Amino acid sequence: MNNNILVFDQVSNLNEPPNILLLSEEDHRVAKNAEIFIDKMITNLKFLSNSNSCDSSKKRKMIEQKTKCSNPRKNCGAKKLKTSPLPQPMTNLSHNHMFSIDEKPKRGRPPKPKPLCCQICLTNNTPYWRWSVIENNKIRVCNRCGQKIFKLEKSINEQLLFRIEIINLLNKIDDEKPIEK
């Protein structure tokens, strides 16, 4: 037997009636778990984005205290973990990227160009690169995929031309028939 639960949404405008949803117990449980998960993620993000929340030296001391043995005379097997620098808070949040981190330009040689890659079969070894238009988007494809696309387009065009010719012939035949009275 499936029991249903009435759920009232929060009202943002006092002039509007609240939204009422009829959910099964399982859907209600899933929705509650999702709300709890989202709330936890928001609090974690607020903590991580707050640069004044805790100094990195304090964090290192906390890590060292957790790894030290409680009795200094006994070696109870607790090993000191290597402490690596903790991640810095996110800065330069731009509207184009959800999370962008400041990057320093590298000195010396310019970066190597990325190898070309076929956007259909993902190969990067071909004697000839082609451009193909798929759904109004121009994409770079390898020679093999480009030839396959060309053959498909050619066969489709031939079929369309053949159908148009048949339709024209049928129309001519209909036009040539004398009208019987």
From Swiss-Prot:
Q: What is this protein called?
A: GATA zinc finger domain-containing protein 22
* GO term, biological process aspect, one: regulation of DNA-templated transcription
Gene Ontology molecular functions: zinc ion binding
**Coiled-coil segments, which residues?**
none
Q: Carries keyword Metal-binding?
A: yes
Keyword annotations for this protein, in alphabetical order, are:
Metal-binding, Zinc, Zinc-finger
Domain of life of the organism encoding this protein:
Eukaryota
Q: Cross-referenced Gene3D superfamilies, in alphabetical order?
A: Erythroid Transcription Factor GATA-1, subunit A
Q: Where are the zinc fingers (GATA-type)?
A: 118-145
